[in-house]
From Swiss-Prot:
Organism annotation: Acidiphilium cryptum (strain JF-5)
Entry-linked SUPFAM superfamilies: YbjQ-like (SSF117782)
Top-level taxon: Bacteria
InterPro entries: UPF0145_dom_sf, UPF0145_YbjQ-like
Name listed for the protein in its UniProt record: UPF0145 protein Acry_1752
Amino acid sequence: MNEILVVTVNEVANARIARVVGPVYGTSIRSRTIVGNMLGGIRAIFGGSQEGYIAMVNQTRDEAIAALKAHAASLGANAVIGMRFDSGEFDAGQGQAMNEVTAYGTAVILEAVM
């Protein structure tokens, strides 16, 4: 599979949009372990950076982008423009919070402009 370009802007320098393929998305859902949640709760009481949560959110975003690229590639696109994130948290029961991130944008076929 060729690398899919993902950008947050709607235009790419030295390229033109040959065809708009359509909307694409990729979603990832992750949770911390019970121990991680307890340690995070203790850190929240005393203040400070939540490295465990930051790492989890970053990994979730990376997975969402990978899924976005796979979706775009499956439709024959070579780029995604206007990429954005949407995120949320939901209760999976028994006090287990799940973090959900969706990356979305418009799949296109770009051609180089000479």
